[in-house]
Amino acid sequence: MRVAIVNDMPLAVEALRRSLAHDPELSLAWIASDGLQAVRRCAADLPDVILMDLMMPVMNGVEATRLIMAESPCAIIVVTSDVLQHTSLVFEAMGHGALDAVDTPVLGRGDPKAAAQRLLRKIRNAGWLIGKKTVALERTTAMASSDTDAALVVIGASAGGPPSLAAVLRALPASFPAAIVLVQHVDAAFTSGMAAWLNEQCVLPVRLASDGLRPEAGVVLLAGAGEHLVLGAERKLHYTTEPRESVYSPSIDVFFHSVAQHWRGRAAGVLLTGMGQDGALGLKAMRERGFFTIAQDRATSAVYGMPKAAAALDAACEILPLGDIAPRLEKVFAPPANPLFN
Protein backbone atom coordinates (compact mmCIF):
# COMPACT_ATOMS: atom_id res chain seq x y z
CA MET A 1 0.00 0.00 0.00
CA ARG A 2 1.12 3.54 -0.73
CA VAL A 3 1.04 5.70 2.40
CA ALA A 4 1.29 9.50 2.51
CA ILE A 5 2.45 11.53 5.52
CA VAL A 6 0.97 14.96 6.31
CA ASN A 7 2.94 16.56 9.16
CA ASP A 8 4.95 19.75 9.63
CA MET A 9 7.29 18.37 12.32
CA PRO A 10 10.54 16.81 10.96
CA LEU A 11 10.95 14.48 13.97
CA ALA A 12 7.39 13.20 13.60
CA VAL A 13 7.88 12.66 9.87
CA GLU A 14 11.06 10.68 10.52
CA ALA A 15 9.32 8.57 13.18
CA LEU A 16 6.53 7.76 10.74
CA ARG A 17 8.99 6.95 7.94
CA ARG A 18 10.83 4.50 10.21
CA SER A 19 7.55 2.93 11.31
CA LEU A 20 6.49 2.31 7.72
CA ALA A 21 9.86 0.71 7.01
CA HIS A 22 8.98 -2.15 9.40
CA ASP A 23 6.33 -3.42 6.96
CA PRO A 24 7.64 -4.40 3.50
CA GLU A 25 4.14 -4.14 2.03
CA LEU A 26 4.03 -0.39 2.74
CA SER A 27 5.71 2.30 0.67
CA LEU A 28 5.92 6.05 1.14
CA ALA A 29 3.87 7.88 -1.51
CA TRP A 30 4.74 11.47 -0.58
CA ILE A 31 5.10 13.92 2.32
CA ALA A 32 3.19 17.17 2.80
CA SER A 33 3.95 19.73 5.52
CA ASP A 34 0.46 21.23 5.77
CA GLY A 35 -3.13 20.43 4.93
CA LEU A 36 -3.31 22.53 1.78
CA GLN A 37 -0.30 20.74 0.31
CA ALA A 38 -1.99 17.44 1.12
CA VAL A 39 -5.21 18.44 -0.66
CA ARG A 40 -3.24 19.39 -3.77
CA ARG A 41 -1.07 16.26 -3.68
CA CYS A 42 -4.13 14.03 -3.35
CA ALA A 43 -5.68 15.61 -6.42
CA ALA A 44 -2.56 14.75 -8.42
CA ASP A 45 -1.44 11.49 -6.80
CA LEU A 46 -3.97 9.71 -4.59
CA PRO A 47 -2.37 7.38 -2.02
CA ASP A 48 -4.06 4.38 -0.42
CA VAL A 49 -3.76 5.73 3.13
CA ILE A 50 -2.96 9.17 4.59
CA LEU A 51 -1.40 9.67 8.03
CA MET A 52 -2.84 13.08 8.92
CA ASP A 53 -1.58 15.38 11.69
CA LEU A 54 -4.09 17.78 13.27
CA MET A 55 -2.21 20.96 14.17
CA MET A 56 -0.37 22.38 11.14
CA PRO A 57 0.19 25.80 9.55
CA VAL A 58 -1.76 27.07 6.52
CA MET A 59 -4.50 24.42 6.88
CA ASN A 60 -5.09 22.07 9.79
CA GLY A 61 -5.78 18.35 9.53
CA VAL A 62 -9.52 18.62 10.15
CA GLU A 63 -10.10 20.97 7.21
CA ALA A 64 -7.72 18.96 5.02
CA THR A 65 -9.66 15.79 5.85
CA ARG A 66 -12.92 17.49 4.93
CA LEU A 67 -11.62 18.68 1.57
CA ILE A 68 -9.87 15.42 0.68
CA MET A 69 -12.93 13.31 1.48
CA ALA A 70 -15.07 15.66 -0.61
CA GLU A 71 -12.73 15.86 -3.60
CA SER A 72 -10.35 12.85 -3.61
CA PRO A 73 -11.60 10.38 -0.98
CA CYS A 74 -9.21 7.84 0.49
CA ALA A 75 -8.46 6.21 3.85
CA ILE A 76 -7.28 8.77 6.43
CA ILE A 77 -5.84 7.98 9.86
CA VAL A 78 -5.27 10.85 12.28
CA VAL A 79 -1.73 10.55 13.67
CA THR A 80 -0.80 13.27 16.13
CA SER A 81 0.97 13.79 19.43
CA ASP A 82 -1.26 12.92 22.41
CA VAL A 83 -4.58 12.27 20.68
CA LEU A 84 -6.43 12.35 24.01
CA GLN A 85 -5.61 16.06 24.30
CA HIS A 86 -7.32 16.66 20.95
CA THR A 87 -10.47 14.56 21.36
CA SER A 88 -12.87 17.16 19.95
CA LEU A 89 -10.68 17.66 16.87
CA VAL A 90 -10.37 13.90 16.38
CA PHE A 91 -14.15 13.49 16.46
CA GLU A 92 -14.48 16.40 14.04
CA ALA A 93 -12.02 14.77 11.64
CA MET A 94 -13.87 11.45 11.96
CA GLY A 95 -17.05 13.32 11.19
CA HIS A 96 -15.51 14.27 7.85
CA GLY A 97 -14.47 10.69 7.14
CA ALA A 98 -11.23 9.90 9.00
CA LEU A 99 -11.17 6.23 9.97
CA ASP A 100 -9.20 6.20 13.20
CA ALA A 101 -6.67 8.03 15.37
CA VAL A 102 -3.40 7.09 17.04
CA ASP A 103 -0.48 8.77 18.80
CA THR A 104 2.62 9.54 16.74
CA PRO A 105 5.42 7.04 17.52
CA VAL A 106 8.29 8.67 19.44
CA LEU A 107 11.89 8.28 18.27
CA GLY A 108 14.42 6.90 20.76
CA ARG A 109 11.88 5.52 23.21
CA GLY A 110 11.89 1.75 23.81
CA ASP A 111 11.79 -0.85 21.04
CA PRO A 112 11.12 1.08 17.79
CA LYS A 113 9.42 -1.89 16.12
CA ALA A 114 7.10 -2.43 19.07
CA ALA A 115 6.31 1.29 19.17
CA ALA A 116 5.33 1.18 15.51
CA GLN A 117 3.01 -1.82 15.79
CA ARG A 118 -0.07 0.10 16.93
CA LEU A 119 0.20 2.43 13.95
CA LEU A 120 0.93 -0.41 11.53
CA ARG A 121 -2.07 -2.37 12.79
CA LYS A 122 -4.35 0.58 12.04
CA ILE A 123 -2.84 0.96 8.57
CA ARG A 124 -3.44 -2.75 7.90
CA ASN A 125 -7.05 -2.38 9.07
CA ALA A 126 -7.49 0.49 6.64
CA GLY A 127 -6.03 -1.73 3.93
CA TRP A 128 -8.66 -4.36 4.59
CA LEU A 129 -11.35 -1.74 4.23
CA ILE A 130 -10.14 -0.22 0.98
CA GLY A 131 -9.49 -3.72 -0.37
CA LYS A 132 -13.12 -4.55 0.41
CA LYS A 133 -12.11 -7.72 2.19
CA THR A 134 -14.77 -8.99 4.55
CA VAL A 135 -14.79 -11.67 7.19
CA ALA A 136 -17.31 -14.38 6.46
CA LEU A 137 -19.73 -14.76 9.32
CA GLU A 138 -22.17 -17.58 9.75
CA ARG A 139 -25.76 -16.68 9.15
CA THR A 140 -27.77 -16.96 12.30
CA THR A 141 -30.84 -19.05 12.81
CA ALA A 142 -33.71 -16.88 14.03
CA MET A 143 -35.32 -17.77 17.31
CA ALA A 144 -39.05 -17.61 17.68
CA SER A 145 -40.42 -14.26 18.82
CA SER A 146 -42.09 -13.98 22.18
CA ASP A 147 -44.90 -11.67 23.22
CA THR A 148 -42.60 -9.26 25.00
CA ASP A 149 -42.97 -5.55 24.33
CA ALA A 150 -39.24 -4.91 24.72
CA ALA A 151 -37.92 -2.66 21.97
CA LEU A 152 -34.34 -2.23 20.78
CA VAL A 153 -32.56 0.02 18.28
CA VAL A 154 -29.04 -0.94 17.21
CA ILE A 155 -26.92 1.51 15.23
CA GLY A 156 -23.57 0.88 13.56
CA ALA A 157 -21.19 3.53 12.23
CA SER A 158 -17.58 4.00 11.19
CA ALA A 159 -15.91 6.88 9.33
CA GLY A 160 -18.06 9.97 9.73
CA GLY A 161 -19.95 8.29 12.55
CA PRO A 162 -19.65 10.49 15.67
CA PRO A 163 -21.53 13.55 14.35
CA SER A 164 -24.01 11.30 12.53
CA LEU A 165 -24.76 9.39 15.72
CA ALA A 166 -25.12 12.69 17.56
CA ALA A 167 -27.56 13.94 14.92
CA VAL A 168 -29.78 10.87 15.29
CA LEU A 169 -29.70 10.86 19.09
CA ARG A 170 -30.25 14.61 19.32
CA ALA A 171 -33.50 14.26 17.39
CA LEU A 172 -34.95 11.58 19.69
CA PRO A 173 -37.13 12.66 22.64
CA ALA A 174 -36.55 11.77 26.28
CA SER A 175 -39.68 9.62 26.06
CA PHE A 176 -38.27 7.39 23.30
CA PRO A 177 -39.51 3.90 24.30
CA ALA A 178 -36.70 1.70 22.96
CA ALA A 179 -33.28 0.79 24.27
CA ILE A 180 -30.43 1.92 22.00
CA VAL A 181 -27.04 0.28 21.50
CA LEU A 182 -24.33 1.92 19.38
CA VAL A 183 -21.34 0.25 17.74
CA GLN A 184 -18.81 2.78 16.42
CA HIS A 185 -15.38 1.94 15.02
CA VAL A 186 -13.13 3.96 17.33
CA ASP A 187 -9.90 3.45 19.23
CA ALA A 188 -10.28 2.19 22.80
CA ALA A 189 -8.72 5.41 24.08
CA PHE A 190 -11.72 7.38 22.84
CA THR A 191 -14.71 5.31 23.95
CA SER A 192 -15.18 6.95 27.36
CA GLY A 193 -14.70 10.40 25.87
CA MET A 194 -17.10 9.64 23.05
CA ALA A 195 -19.79 8.40 25.45
CA ALA A 196 -19.42 11.60 27.49
CA TRP A 197 -19.49 13.72 24.34
CA LEU A 198 -22.63 12.03 23.02
CA ASN A 199 -24.24 12.38 26.44
CA GLU A 200 -23.88 16.15 26.08
CA GLN A 201 -25.47 16.12 22.64
CA CYS A 202 -28.86 14.63 23.49
CA VAL A 203 -31.51 14.32 26.19
CA LEU A 204 -31.19 10.54 26.39
CA PRO A 205 -28.50 9.31 28.81
CA VAL A 206 -25.45 7.81 27.07
CA ARG A 207 -22.98 5.51 28.79
CA LEU A 208 -20.53 2.75 27.97
CA ALA A 209 -21.95 -0.75 27.71
CA SER A 210 -20.63 -2.98 30.49
CA ASP A 211 -20.53 -6.76 30.52
CA GLY A 212 -23.73 -8.32 31.84
CA LEU A 213 -25.85 -5.20 31.34
CA ARG A 214 -29.34 -5.47 29.85
CA PRO A 215 -30.43 -2.87 27.28
CA GLU A 216 -32.86 -0.48 28.96
CA ALA A 217 -35.61 1.59 27.36
CA GLY A 218 -34.62 5.22 26.96
CA VAL A 219 -30.93 4.57 27.64
CA VAL A 220 -28.15 4.67 25.04
CA LEU A 221 -25.24 2.24 25.42
CA LEU A 222 -22.00 2.63 23.46
CA ALA A 223 -19.92 -0.49 22.77
CA GLY A 224 -16.45 -0.42 24.22
CA ALA A 225 -13.45 -1.05 21.95
CA GLY A 226 -10.94 -3.88 21.90
CA GLU A 227 -13.49 -6.72 21.98
CA HIS A 228 -16.74 -7.55 20.20
CA LEU A 229 -20.03 -6.68 21.88
CA VAL A 230 -22.70 -9.38 21.59
CA LEU A 231 -26.22 -9.93 22.87
CA GLY A 232 -26.70 -13.22 24.69
CA ALA A 233 -29.73 -15.50 24.85
CA GLU A 234 -30.62 -14.02 28.26
CA ARG A 235 -30.79 -10.56 26.64
CA LYS A 236 -27.65 -9.38 28.39
CA LEU A 237 -24.68 -7.74 26.69
CA HIS A 238 -21.31 -9.48 26.77
CA TYR A 239 -17.83 -8.91 25.38
CA THR A 240 -15.92 -11.57 23.47
CA THR A 241 -12.67 -11.83 21.52
CA GLU A 242 -14.26 -14.11 18.90
CA PRO A 243 -14.13 -13.98 15.93
CA ARG A 244 -10.47 -12.95 16.19
CA GLU A 245 -10.10 -12.46 12.43
CA SER A 246 -12.48 -9.50 12.31
CA VAL A 247 -10.78 -6.29 11.22
CA TYR A 248 -12.48 -4.16 13.86
CA SER A 249 -13.30 -4.85 17.48
CA PRO A 250 -16.11 -4.22 18.07
CA SER A 251 -17.53 -5.50 14.80
CA ILE A 252 -20.93 -4.20 13.72
CA ASP A 253 -21.64 -7.45 11.88
CA VAL A 254 -20.92 -9.55 14.97
CA PHE A 255 -23.27 -7.47 17.12
CA PHE A 256 -26.09 -7.26 14.55
CA HIS A 257 -25.94 -11.05 14.03
CA SER A 258 -26.24 -11.63 17.78
CA VAL A 259 -29.29 -9.35 17.90
CA ALA A 260 -30.87 -11.22 14.99
CA GLN A 261 -30.30 -14.47 16.84
CA HIS A 262 -31.29 -13.60 20.39
CA TRP A 263 -33.56 -10.54 20.60
CA ARG A 264 -37.18 -11.59 21.09
CA GLY A 265 -38.98 -8.26 21.12
CA ARG A 266 -39.26 -5.57 18.49
CA ALA A 267 -36.05 -4.22 17.01
CA ALA A 268 -34.66 -1.92 14.36
CA GLY A 269 -31.18 -1.89 12.87
CA VAL A 270 -29.54 1.21 11.42
CA LEU A 271 -26.31 1.33 9.41
CA LEU A 272 -24.72 4.75 9.07
CA THR A 273 -21.75 6.23 7.23
CA GLY A 274 -18.52 4.24 7.06
CA MET A 275 -15.83 2.77 4.83
CA GLY A 276 -15.87 -0.92 3.96
CA GLN A 277 -18.71 -3.39 4.44
CA ASP A 278 -18.94 -4.07 8.18
CA GLY A 279 -22.57 -4.25 9.28
CA ALA A 280 -24.09 -5.05 5.88
CA LEU A 281 -24.38 -8.80 6.46
CA GLY A 282 -25.60 -8.27 10.01
CA LEU A 283 -28.26 -5.82 8.85
CA LYS A 284 -29.35 -8.38 6.25
CA ALA A 285 -29.67 -11.00 9.00
CA MET A 286 -31.83 -8.63 11.03
CA ARG A 287 -34.11 -7.95 8.07
CA GLU A 288 -34.46 -11.67 7.37
CA ARG A 289 -35.41 -12.12 11.03
CA GLY A 290 -38.29 -9.69 10.44
CA PHE A 291 -36.79 -6.60 12.07
CA PHE A 292 -37.03 -3.15 10.53
CA THR A 293 -33.77 -1.95 8.98
CA ILE A 294 -32.45 1.38 7.71
CA ALA A 295 -29.33 2.35 5.75
CA GLN A 296 -28.15 5.94 5.42
CA ASP A 297 -28.34 7.37 1.91
CA ARG A 298 -25.40 8.34 -0.28
CA ALA A 299 -26.03 12.10 -0.20
CA THR A 300 -25.75 12.45 3.59
CA SER A 301 -23.03 9.83 4.22
CA ALA A 302 -19.54 11.18 4.87
CA VAL A 303 -18.27 7.88 3.45
CA TYR A 304 -20.72 5.80 1.42
CA GLY A 305 -19.22 2.36 1.97
CA MET A 306 -21.08 0.36 4.62
CA PRO A 307 -24.55 1.72 3.70
CA LYS A 308 -23.79 1.08 0.02
CA ALA A 309 -22.90 -2.54 0.81
CA ALA A 310 -26.15 -2.91 2.76
CA ALA A 311 -28.15 -1.47 -0.13
CA ALA A 312 -26.46 -3.87 -2.56
CA LEU A 313 -27.49 -6.82 -0.35
CA ASP A 314 -31.06 -5.50 -0.07
CA ALA A 315 -30.44 -5.47 3.68
CA ALA A 316 -32.33 -2.22 4.32
CA CYS A 317 -36.10 -1.91 4.41
CA GLU A 318 -35.59 1.80 3.79
CA ILE A 319 -32.68 3.99 2.64
CA LEU A 320 -32.99 7.40 4.28
CA PRO A 321 -31.11 10.70 4.60
CA LEU A 322 -29.59 11.23 8.02
CA GLY A 323 -32.18 13.80 9.09
CA ASP A 324 -35.08 11.39 8.45
CA ILE A 325 -33.76 8.47 10.49
CA ALA A 326 -34.77 9.61 13.99
CA PRO A 327 -38.33 10.63 12.96
CA ARG A 328 -38.71 7.24 11.25
CA LEU A 329 -37.59 5.42 14.38
CA GLU A 330 -40.10 7.40 16.41
CA LYS A 331 -42.89 6.27 14.09
CA VAL A 332 -41.72 2.67 14.12
CA PHE A 333 -41.83 2.46 17.91
CA ALA A 334 -44.79 4.75 18.54
CA PRO A 335 -47.80 3.12 20.20
CA PRO A 336 -49.83 1.31 18.98
CA ALA A 337 -47.35 -1.22 17.64
CA ASN A 338 -46.30 -0.53 14.07
CA PRO A 339 -47.81 -3.03 11.56
CA LEU A 340 -44.30 -3.75 10.29
CA PHE A 341 -43.79 -5.86 13.41
CA ASN A 342 -47.11 -7.72 13.41
Curated annotation (Swiss-Prot):
Q: List the disulfide bonds.
A: none
| Highest taxon listed in the record's lineage | Bacteria
Record field: catalytic activity: [protein]-L-glutamate 5-O-methyl ester + H2O = L-glutamyl-[protein] + methanol + H(+); L-glutaminyl-[protein] + H2O = L-glutamyl-[protein] + NH4(+)
Q: Where mainly found?
A: cytoplasm
Q: Which UniProt keywords apply?
A: Chemotaxis, Cytoplasm, Hydrolase, Phosphoprotein
Q: What GO molecular function terms would the record report?
A: phosphorelay response regulator activity; protein-glutamate methylesterase activity; protein-glutamine glutaminase activity
- Entries under CDD domains matching the protein: CheB_Rec, REC_CheB-like
Cite the post-translational modification comment: Phosphorylated by CheA. Phosphorylation of the N-terminal regulatory domain activates the methylesterase activity.
Q: Which PROSITE patterns match?
A: CHEB, RESPONSE_REGULATORY
Q: Name one GO cellular component term.
A: cytoplasm
Q: What is its EC number?
A: 3.1.1.61, 3.5.1.44
Which InterPro entries does the record cross-reference, listed alphabetically? CheB-like, CheB_C, CheY-like_superfamily, Sig_transdc_resp-reg_Me-estase, Sig_transdc_resp-reg_receiver
Intracellular or extracellular location(s): Cytoplasm
Active-site residues, record numbering mapped to chain: S158, H185, D278
Q: Which residues form the CheB-type methylesterase domain?
A: 146-329
- Which parts of the sequence belong to the Response regulatory domain? 2-119
Family according to the record: Belongs to the CheB family.
Provide the domain comment: Contains a C-terminal catalytic domain, and an N-terminal region which modulates catalytic activity.
Q: What is this protein called?
A: Protein-glutamate methylesterase/protein-glutamine glutaminase 1
Name the gene behind this protein. cheB1
